[in-house]
Amino acid sequence: MQIDDDDWWTDLGHKARKDFGRKPVIEIDVLEGVEPLDAQFGVTLPRTVPVTLQEPLFGQPADSGQDPDVLYTYAVLDAAKILGLPELLENTDLDHDCLFQGTAAEELRHAAPWIVKLEENNRFTRALFTKGSGPRDLWDSDPGIFCRSKHTLDDVRKHLRKFTKVRDGHGRWLYFRFWEGVPLRAYLDTVSLEHPASLSFYGTAERLLIDAVLTRDYAGRFVKHHCQAIPDTLESNASGRLTSVQEQALAT
């Protein structure tokens, strides 16, 4: 498979400026008590997501007197966990695309990651958070992660494609299934000003592509990583490799 120059990490290791160290880079919120939706039979206005997730997934920036950019909600879903996901998405009115492309997208479409722009009051969005015995009650499948972004699906897709494959400390390519919440959270938890490599998952100093990421852990809690900002003076690390801390986190 041919690798495009902009497909993989080229700007991973950074050193933050000193004054930036006084500001929080990432805010981490653990959302406890998230209860999945039930069938909501007889409910006039059924909920789209659990109450606890309404603001994290569909809330908008506070009105500061200026026109704030709208935050969109994206899910990156594992087709191996949802039977017939490509066909299911084709029958929705939601924007979506496969993170793989070319031959890989065709041959692996039923096991590939798919990005979909979620909308409120949408049946598919609701299904992701509904627990039940039906074939489209998808809560128990825990199929992916959720992102908030001010950018289009095409922009977010192009950015996330860079992270399907990473280099370890020996320069070897590794597949990174970041659409599985537990390994992604382990990776994002390694952010620090000493080793802020995973800030690149959110974007660059010039362009913040991902404002927040929500993942679900083994205990059923949701964890929200919110990127406040990316330092505007960063030094590139030409090696573009995972730090030892990140390797240990992903191996756990």
Indicate where each model-derived feature is located.
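Terminal low-complexity "docking" segments
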Residues: 1-177, 181-252
